[in-house]
A protein has these predicted regions:
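N-terminus-centered regions that define maturation/targeting leaders and the start
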Residues: 1-216
């Protein structure tokens, strides 16, 4: 199975239009265009293929927030890192081969895009999961809410490392993952539900930083 994107090259910098945040002309961070990137997959398995799942995660998020966005320091490079899910999309039909750039997100939506089935050009049964901005903004009176669908990169502006954004497409042997409709669909729940059902997978990775020292 092969995954490609016309929006970025594998292991190259994510263009700012596909990020949630960008380096500000004044201050540190400004909101960006927040468009979802293009993804296309090929060489899919034959036989029992029934659906696809798309996940985007950042494996480089600081495990503690003590140093995040502090003027007098950077987040240490050796701090343990954890996953942050930016996009969870399940039950894409077996004949799907592409997601067009900007069709699942275009601009930042304060308090989050609607879900689990936003008004998007997708087939019946497709579900958008909650991304981890739901937890990140939980204490922000202006931004808190349920963040469904894609919301792009916005790493700490003082992080000492460049973050990676891993887009993975899974070919699955069931038409719908067994996750109760009333449950809030998270990245962790999807990865658990995928166990034993993945026929093939492919990934592409983009990098991004808001640290002027690293962003160039």
């Amino acid at each position: 199975m092969r995954l490609t994107s016309t929006s970025f090259a594998n292991d190259a910098t994510l263009p700012v239009e596909f990020a949630f945040g960008k380096v500000a002309s004044e201050g540190h961070v400004a909101l960006s265009s927040n468009r979802n990137p293009h993804l296309a997959w090929s060489d899919v398995p034959d036989g029992t293929l029934s659906s696809f799942v798309v996940v985007c995660h950042d494996p480089d998020v600081p495990s503690r927030g003590d140093d995040v966005d502090r003027e007098d320091r950077e987040v240490p490079h050796d701090l343990p890192r954890v996953d942050f899910f930016h996009w969870v999309l399940i039950n894409l039909p077996a004949d799907a081969r592409e997601i067009v750039a900007g069709t699942h997100s275009h601009g930042v939506t304060p308090r989050g895009k609607k879900g689990p089935r936003p008004d998007l050009p997708v087939a019946d049964g497709v579900r958008h999961g909650l991304n981890d901005y739901t937890g990140w903004f939980a204490g922000d009176a202006d931004m808190k809410g349920d963040y469904y669908g894609y919301d792009g990169a916005c790493p700490p502006w003082n992080d000492s490392i460049v973050h990676r954004y891993v887009f993975t497409v899974y070919a699955v042997d069931v038409p719908r993952l067994e996750i109760p409709e009333h449950h809030a669909l998270t990245g962790a729940q999807v990865l658990a539900a995928l166990q034993g059902h993945v026929l093939a997978e492919a990934a592409v990775t983009a990098t991004y930083s808001l640290n002027p020292r690293l962003a160039g």
